């Protein structure tokens, strides 16, 4: 990686073999956070979950080195309003739909880094009946036995499906960036 870190979990042992086994890695150069400076986005699919990551670097003229602004599991989606949808690498629940837990990041220019502004998890009692004693039935207004736990800044929310869809639609109202990724060899 640009800062000298190794991108696979075995820390450099057998690099050629790891590279041969790995999924295609990719990069794009783009001003992803609208700060008028191009960033280097790198996607490493790797050979296993532990290798899979996406990075955002910016070159610091002052320090004459790359600065890491963001590091997360592979599969992020980048929005024109500056948000990053970042899917979790693992989950503690089972899902009957296409939901997967995720976090949302926004660039903090003062801190020169991306910070997590939201995290979302779904509890579907139909898929996980063992949680019935702890399920917040009073928050399940539509009665479908599905609730979304949302941490948004300092607020902790329990939303039923309609409320969650409204919240998500407002948050991700801007378009996805159409990024022209290139193979990293």
What are these regions (language model features)?
Residues 16-19, 44-49, 91-98:
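Short consensus segments that form the blades of beta-propeller domains
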Residues 5-26, 72-81, 125-127:
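Repeat-based blade/solenoid architectures
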Residues 2-3, 10, 50-68, 104-110:
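Beta-propeller blade repeat segments, especially FG-GAP/WD-type strand-to-loop junctions
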Residues 31-44, 81-88:
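Acidic/hydrophobic-patterned starts of short beta strands in beta-sheet-rich repeat architectures
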Residues 17, 65-69, 86-87, 116:
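Short hydrophobic/aromatic-rich beta-strand segments that constitute the beta-sheet cores
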Residues 37, 54, 99-102:
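Extracellular structured ligand-interaction cores
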Residues 59-84:
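Long amphipathic alpha-helical scaffold regions
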Residues 80-185:
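Acidic, small-residue rich beta-repeat scaffolds with periodic aromatic anchors
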């Amino acid at each position: 990686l640009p800062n000298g870190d190794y991108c696979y979990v075995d820390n450099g042992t057998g690099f050629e073999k790891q590279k041969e086994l790995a999924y295609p890695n990719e990069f794009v150069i783009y001003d992803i956070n609208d700060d008028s400076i191009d960033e280097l986005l790198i996607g490493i699919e790797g050979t296993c979950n532990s290798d899979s990551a996406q990075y955002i670097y910016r070159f610091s003229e002052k320090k004459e080195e790359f600065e890491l602004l963001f590091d997360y599991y592979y599969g992020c989606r980048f929005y024109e309003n500056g948000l990053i949808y970042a899917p979790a690498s693992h989950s503690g629940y089972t899902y009957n739909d296409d939901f997967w837990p995720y976090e949302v990041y926004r660039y903090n220019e003062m801190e020169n880094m991306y910070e997590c502004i939201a995290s979302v998890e779904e509890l579907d009692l139909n898929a996980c009946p063992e949680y019935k004693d702890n399920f917040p039935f009073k928050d399940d207004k539509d009665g479908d036995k599905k609730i979304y736990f949302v941490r948004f800044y300092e607020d902790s929310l329990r939303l039923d499906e309609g409320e969650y869809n409204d919240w998500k639609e407002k948050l991700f109202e801007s378009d996805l960036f159409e990024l022209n990724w290139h193979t990293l060899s």
